[in-house]
Amino acid sequence: MPKLSQDEIDDLKDVFELFDFWDGRDGAVDAFKLGDVCRCLGINPRNEDVFAVGGTHKMGEKSLPFEEFLPAYEGLMDCEQGTFADYMEAFKTFDREGQGFISGAELRHVLTALGERLSDEDVDEIIKLTDLQEDLEGNVKYEDFVKKVMAGPYPDK
């Protein structure tokens, strides 16, 4: 596990304190938000990994002070994250004709209903930030979508 520098720890603390502010300024963050905090810090852990290091399934089950958050974050830094090939393989499942396209509606369904479920608002934001273009039949080229999502962060539009 890589050792974090003091500057990195300070950055973690800043983001942690922002979530603490939203949670009531009690010096802790709800463990339900552990994955969200980590995603804001640039890692994309799977939910099962978040649960393994102390994340919870429901709000209010447990709070994490920074002293407990830090080792959880460090543990998640080393967890496997999805690769471009993984995402392409997943989208191919929905590409019935093997042409590299899926419908925009199906993309929305995949993102909101399967795996790491996103809210409709999150999907709207992703589509906006990636400047996702549908063809005349309402299909999107999923390779372009995956590349744009994985390239983040996005400039202000």
From Swiss-Prot:
Write one Pfam family the protein is assigned to: EF-hand_7
Q: Which PROSITE patterns match?
A: EF_HAND_2
**Domain EF-hand: from-to ranges:** 7-44, 82-117
The record's annotation in InterPro entries points to: CALM/Myosin/TropC-like (IPR050230), EF-hand-dom_pair (IPR011992), EF_hand_dom (IPR002048)
The UniProt GO MF terms for this protein read: calcium ion binding
Q: Does the keyword Repeat apply?
A: yes
Give the keywords, sorted.
Motor protein, Muscle protein, Myosin, Repeat
One GO cellular component, as annotated? muscle myosin complex
Function (record text): In molluscan muscle, calcium regulation is associated with myosin rather than with actin. Muscle myosin contains two types of light chains: the catalytic light chain, essential for ATPase activity, and the regulatory light chain, a calcium-binding protein responsible for Ca(2+) dependent binding and Ca(2+) dependent Mg-ATPase activity.
Instruction: Write the protein's name.
Output: Myosin essential light chain, striated adductor muscle
